[in-house]
Amino acid sequence: NPNLTWETSEQWDLGLDLDLFRNRLSLQMDYFDKRTFNLIQTQTMNWPSTIGLDAMLVNQGEVRNRGFEFQANWSDRVNKNFSYYISGNFSYLKNWVSDIGVKNADGTPGVWVGDGSFRSTLPYVYQTAEGQPLNSFYLIKTNGIFQSDEEAAAYVDKNGNRIQPDAVAGDLKFVDYNGDGKIDDGDRQYCGNATPKTTFSFSGGITYKKLSVSAMFQGVGGAQSLYVAKCMLLSDVEGNFNRSKEILNAWSETNTSSNIPRLSKNDPNGNFTTPSDWYLEDASYLRLKNLTVSYDLSDYLRKWSHMKERNSNLMVYLSGENLFTITNYSGYDPEVSKESSILTPGIDDSSYPRSKGFVFGINLSL
């Protein structure tokens, strides 16, 4: 396709680097504004479904990324036996589509629709519009759970008609956003996105004589994930696969404080088949990424004269990875994602989480 070109990016930065206190303290600060245009993506509008071919790749749209990064490092040797260091970084990112690149028939800006559907149960959950971030979740909002049949029956439109005619106590209450008296795709709203607003990490280490200990923490803030696995794990009680133990906490007349809808065989209210923000969760986290303890045995090794002549070294260490995670996310791992497309991240269908691991090693140089 001779009309298809590479994506183009323009970026400007404003930075500041400082070294203070005889280089014990270093600071790096950077503000950036990046514009990426002629994005390469599949044509999602004006492509007839009857043509029998997949939609072609086209250049369309413009994305902006604006934010700042900050990093600080401090290291010091207190005496010949003791030294330490502390390091941390923090970044903030604001992302939005500044030009969608397509128009509707009436001349208004179009949208990019990402699939993100889950099996045959949940339809598409993504849509990106001009002024919205990439990876925007496009969902029907909920307003709690009906606590009685009377409350469900009283949820009516301006004409007195029930908005959710099949709802009873224990069902989700969906927001009739467009006010037409029914719950459908017209009630979808932009509900955030999977891209973290902030990312951060900090690490530190101490060395006392031959013993060294170091640790690194890493995390994100403002990220969201659509935990679609709840559709299987918390829905009807029949089937040939295990449910989550949290299903025991589903709403009932004796457990009215639960945020899990009631158990039912056919789900007449669509609690689990409606693409709603009930699936959407805060995926912010703080993780102990690495902890390492090491001991230098070189002095013992060099007691042999030929090892001393060669200045040989010996160190043993024990290292742990992904030792614990602090998060409000109810899934296995707030970092996992089923989807890999740029327009469909942040879907969690209980993909395998990052594993915890331990490594014992020996570093020997002769």
Model-predicted regions and their roles:
Residues 57-65, 112-146, 250-258, 273, ...:
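C-terminal beta-signal and terminal closure region of outer-membrane beta-barrel proteins
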Residues 37-43, 92-117, 222-251, 326-336:
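Outer-membrane beta-barrel and related beta-rich outer-membrane complex signature
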Residues 4-5, 31-78, 171-174, 187-191:
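Outer membrane beta-barrel strand-and-loop segments of large Gram-negative receptors
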Residues 161, 220-315, 319-321:
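Extracytoplasmic gating/loop element in the C-terminal half of outer-membrane beta-barrel translocons
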Residues 4, 8, 43-55, 67, ...:
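Flexible, solvent-exposed coil segments and beta strand-coil junctions
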Residues 12-20, 25-33, 68-76, 84-92, ...:
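Membrane-embedded beta-strands that build the outer-membrane beta-barrel scaffold
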Residues 58, 75-192, 321:
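Conserved small-residue
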Residues 1-26, 55-79, 131-139, 193-198, ...:
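Outer-membrane beta-barrel signature, preferentially recognizing the C-terminal barrel domain
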